[in-house]
Amino acid sequence: MKILIASSHGYKVRETKAFLKKIGEFDIFSLVDYPSYTPPKETGETPEENAIQKGVFAAQTFRCWTIADDSMLIIPALGGLPGKLSASFSGEHASDKDHRKKLLEEMLLLENPIDRSAYFECCVVLVSPFGKIFKAHASCEGTIVFKERGSSGFGYDPLFSKHDYKQTYAELPEEIKNQVSHRAKALAKLQPYVEMAFANHLLARNESL
């Protein structure tokens, strides 16, 4: 069964490949294999809206099953920021490090800088070649630390410490983060839909023999 990971981000691709390999033998490819591909502009207000935009567009383009995701970091003390601006907090073409720098600067301006609670919201979707959408949501609560810690991961990982863990996402071993992160939890909820699609694929293939 051919399946596309609608991402060109190496970390996300590795995580999703590992997830799929636990389910069955897929012909897996990603947007890393198509550097000329231009994804749609993310205009959604929520992770679900953005994930669906990315997933449906890619499924229509490549005519195959597609997995897409979107996440937002929400900090109540900042009025919900960065929220839908998570990927462009300090500018559309700025780096992850630039976004983290701006976030720490914004946290310094808080009336109560001790209130550093935050959470990630994530949606992962599975889209069929015909546009049928299956979706799963998850979130992770934590805090924003006072300075960057750790060198792995991406995005806001060096600043986000999940509740029940002393380390930031960027300090956790990749195999641990891939079990406890918001994306990992959403993928786990999506698993029954992926298994169903794979089983239907095997059934159709056997009937054609």
Curated annotation (Swiss-Prot):
Binding site for Mg(2+): D70
Alphabetized UniProt keyword annotations: Hydrolase, Magnesium, Metal-binding, Nucleotide metabolism, Nucleotide-binding
Catalytic residues in the record: D70
InterPro entries on file: dITP/XTP_pyrophosphatase, ITPase-like_fam, RdgB/HAM1
Cofactor notes: Binds 1 Mg(2+) ion per subunit.
UniProt GO cellular component terms: cytosol
This enzyme's EC code(s): 3.6.1.66
Residue positions binding substrate: S7, S8, H9, G10, Y11, K12, S71, F154, G155, Y156, D157, K177, H182, R183
Record CDD domains: HAM1
Cysteine pairings via disulfide bonds: none
Reaction(s) the record says it catalyses: XTP + H2O = XMP + diphosphate + H(+); dITP + H2O = dIMP + diphosphate + H(+); ITP + H2O = IMP + diphosphate + H(+)
GO molecular function terms listed in the Swiss-Prot or TrEMBL record: dITP diphosphatase activity; ITP diphosphatase activity; metal ion binding; nucleotide binding; ribonucleoside triphosphate phosphatase activity; XTP diphosphatase activity
Cofactor(s) in the UniProt record: Mg(2+)
Role played: Pyrophosphatase that catalyzes the hydrolysis of nucleoside triphosphates to their monophosphate derivatives, with a high preference for the non-canonical purine nucleotides XTP (xanthosine triphosphate), dITP (deoxyinosine triphosphate) and ITP. Seems to function as a house-cleaning enzyme that removes non-canonical purine nucleotides from the nucleotide pool, thus preventing their incorporation into DNA/RNA and avoiding chromosomal lesions.
Subunit text: Homodimer.
Cross-referenced HAMAP family: Non_canon_purine_NTPase (MF_01405)
Family designation: Belongs to the HAM1 NTPase family.
Protein name: dITP/XTP pyrophosphatase
